Design a protein with these regions (language model features):
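Short, cationic-aromatic polyanion-contact patches
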Residues: 3-6, 58-80
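Short acidic, hydrophobic short linear motifs in intrinsically disordered regions
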Residues: 20-29
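Amphipathic alpha-helical dimerization/coiled-coil segments
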Residues: 76-109
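Short amphipathic alpha-helical interaction segments
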Residues: 34-49
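A short, conserved structural fragment
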Residues: 48-60
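Short alpha-helical segments that sit at the start of domains
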Residues: 1-13, 17, 74, 85-89
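Alpha-helix N-cap and coil->helix boundary residues
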Residues: 5, 21-22, 39
Length: 109
């Protein structure tokens, strides 16, 4: 599963949110990126096609209704899927051991 840099940035917004979000809320959250609404619309549809984002309902937005979205997988699940695609299955136990060792040597936050 490959996400573009922009798609990853959109997903970071969703992973950090504690609620489903409409496109307009995503647009207002990324004011520094200066994405156009149409670009975000395309990215949201692409993220749904890739299975990392799902439509969960509708919310009133002005005189119309807007779809709301939430992650279809957690950030950790996404990273696991990316690693699983890149790493041969026989090396996964070694990766898990390295992660456990890293956790043991990293101070808790």
């Amino acid at each position: 599963m490959h996400l573009t840099k922009s798609e990853q940035q959109i997903m970071e917004i969703f992973w950090q949110a504690d609620h489903a979000m409409a496109q307009t809320e995503v647009v207002s959250t990324c004011v520094e990126r200066k994405w156009k609404e149409r670009s975000i619309f395309s990215m949201l549809n692409s993220l749904m096609e890739k299975g990392v984002l799902r439509e969960v309902g509708f919310v009133r937005s002005g005189k119309t209704y807007a779809r709301t979205f939430e992650p279809a997988m957690s950030h950790a699940e996404y990273l696991a899927a990316v690693v699983a695609e890149q790493l041969p299955a026989k090396q996964l136990p070694e990766l898990l051991a390295a992660l456990m060792q890293k956790m043991e040597t990293t101070p808790a936050i």
